[in-house]
């Protein structure tokens, strides 16, 4: 009997590769350190190239199947639509409007719902073992052993490291590779509003869009819909900007080495800085000194991970292959990590299908296909954060150019 493929991590990439392998009758087991009730209820943006790859791999499922299962506004019959408009968070005025004829190419997805939907997209149940925190990986391609802190030990043909930016697999196999901290400030808040209050406070500004994107002078304050229930709306917000810290200046909000406990505390400097921004409604009604202590607030430290081809080749000899953030983590704000994690999982599963007898060739083929895409994505993600946090004068210039182009297009049409 062929030893199973051992997948470390039950996030998006781990569940996706497991689901596709299971659908192809390739034995595999997913190991997850946390308990089944863990929550990552925030929403993410799925781009068309990401969800199309996933839907195709799951048997050419229609897009509506996905949106019915994962869209934050699915209870209203929504499709996770966002208008991609940018508004001045000081005045509330529309700065950059999208082309009204543009096709929807981004779907917002509730992360919890997406994990469930992926796991359920097949006849046979995926095998997930919760409460299994990895201790060690040993062996070579075709014969690897994973040992867990609870004493469990499993032999497999291959270990797929799908365990994120702080990958336990990577820290053992490639201990010299550690995440780089990106010098940016990101605070993330979660809250819940009664439906009526949401309809009165947010809907007049956002309309049917699942994101109300507010930009300021070098800082952003998006408000996003995470999930809508019959009685309440779960929202989150972010306050983000580049760090101002240098040798002469200390940035009180840039805390790259903050502990897990400290990351959940609201620093007084955050309240002071937000108060100084003079935000317009509805941002001012959520982001203020009275409201913030009632929210769940987190200081997100943005990290990137990059590896060399020599690194992954060395890991391959030890029977390990990487997918998702374990080998190409990107900043949460402005990155496309979730999409690349899905595509990684699809491409690795495709490479493995029918090649169980030649795992080395399958893994090499996967890296050959994914390498350039992932390396360029990490590089772009660093640049994208700063592009999304421009000075207001640049946003105004962009807005004027778009107005001129729209006017010229209108003249040409007549």
Swiss-Prot record:
The keyword Oxidoreductase is annotated on this UniProt entry: yes
Q: Which InterPro entries does this entry report, sorted A to Z?
A: FAD-bd, FAD/NAD-bd_sf
Enzyme Commission identifier(s): 1.-.-.-
Pfam families the record matches: FAD_binding_3
Q: Locate the residues binding FAD.
A: 32, 43, 115, 325, 338
Top-rank lineage group of the source organism:
Eukaryota
Q: Which reaction does it catalyse?
A: 3-(2,4-dioxopentyl)-3,6,8,9-tetrahydroxy-1-oxo-1,2,3,4-tetrahydroanthracene-2-carboxyl-[ACP] + NADPH + O2 + H(+) = 3-(2,4-dioxopentyl)-2,3,6,8,9-pentahydroxy-1-oxo-1,2,3,4-tetrahydroanthracene-2-carboxyl-[ACP] + NADP(+) + H2O
Keywords noted in UniProt: FAD, Flavoprotein, Monooxygenase, Oxidoreductase
MF (Gene Ontology): FAD binding; monooxygenase activity
* Top EC group: oxidoreductase
Annotated pathway, please?
Secondary metabolite biosynthesis
Cofactor dependence: FAD
Family the UniProt entry places it in: Belongs to the paxM FAD-dependent monooxygenase family.
**Free-text function comment from the UniProt entry:** FAD-dependent monooxygenase; part of the gene cluster that mediates the biosynthesis of the linear tetracyclic TAN-1612 neuropeptide Y receptor antagonist. The decaketide backbone of TAN-1612 is synthesized by the non-reducing polyketide synthase adaA via condensation of one acetyl-CoA starter unit with 9 malonyl-CoA units. The FAD-dependent monooxygenase adaC then performs hydroxylation at C2 while the polaketide chain is still attached to the NRPKS adaA.
Q: What is this protein called?
A: FAD-dependent monooxygenase adaC
The species this protein belongs to is Aspergillus niger (strain ATCC MYA-4892 / CBS 513.88 / FGSC A1513)
Gene name per UniProt: adaC
């Amino acid at each position: 009997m062929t030893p199973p493929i051992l997948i470390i991590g039950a996030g998006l990439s781990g569940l996706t590769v497991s689901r596709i392998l299971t659908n192809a009758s390739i034995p595999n087991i997913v190991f997850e350190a946390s308990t089944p009730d863990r929550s990552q209820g925030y929403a993410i943006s799925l781009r068309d190239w990401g969800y199309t790859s996933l839907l195709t791999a799951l048997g050419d499922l229609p897009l509506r199947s996905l949106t019915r299962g994962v869209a934050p506004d699915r209870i209203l019959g929504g499709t996770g639509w966002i208008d991609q408009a940018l508004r001045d968070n000081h005045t509330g005025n529309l700065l950059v409007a999208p082309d009204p004829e543009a096709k929807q190419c981004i779907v917002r997805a509730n992360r919890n719902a997406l994990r469930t939907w992926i796991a359920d997209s097949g006849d046979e149940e995926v095998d997930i073992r919760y409460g299994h925190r990895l201790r060690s990986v040993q062996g070579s391609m075709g014969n690897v052993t994973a040992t867990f802190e609870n004493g469990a030990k499993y032999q497999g043909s291959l270990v797929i490291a799908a365990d994120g930016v702080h990958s336990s697999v990577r820290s053992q196999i490639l201990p010299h590779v550690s995440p780089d901290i990106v010098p940016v400030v990101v605070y993330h808040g979660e809250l819940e509003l009664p439906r009526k209050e949401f309809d009165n406070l947010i809907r007049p500004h956002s309309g049917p869009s699942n994101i109300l994107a507010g930009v300021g002078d070098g800082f952003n304050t998006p408000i996003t819909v995470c999930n809508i229930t019959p009685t309440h709306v779960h929202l989150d917000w972010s306050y983000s900007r580049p760090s101002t810290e240098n040798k002469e200046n200390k940035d009180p909000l840039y805390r790259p080495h903050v502990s897990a406990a400290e990351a959940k505390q609201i620093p007084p400097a955050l309240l002071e800085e937000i108060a100084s921004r003079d935000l317009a409604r509805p941002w001012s009604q959520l982001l203020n000194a009275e409201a913030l202590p009632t929210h769940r607030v987190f200081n997100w430290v943005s990290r990137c991970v990059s590896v060399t081809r020599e690194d992954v080749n060395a890991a391959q000899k030890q029977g390990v292959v990487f997918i998702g953030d374990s080998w190409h983590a990107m900043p949460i704000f402005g990155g496309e990590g979730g999409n690349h994690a899905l595509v990684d999982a699809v491409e690795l599963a495709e490479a493995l299908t029918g090649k169980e007898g030649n795992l080395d060739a399958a893994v090499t083929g996967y890296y050959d296909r994914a390498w350039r895409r992932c390396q360029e994505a990490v590089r772009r993600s660093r640049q994208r954060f700063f592009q999304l946090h421009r000075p207001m004068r640049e946003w105004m210039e962009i807005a004027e150019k778009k107005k001129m182009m729209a006017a010229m297009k209108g003249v040409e049409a007549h």
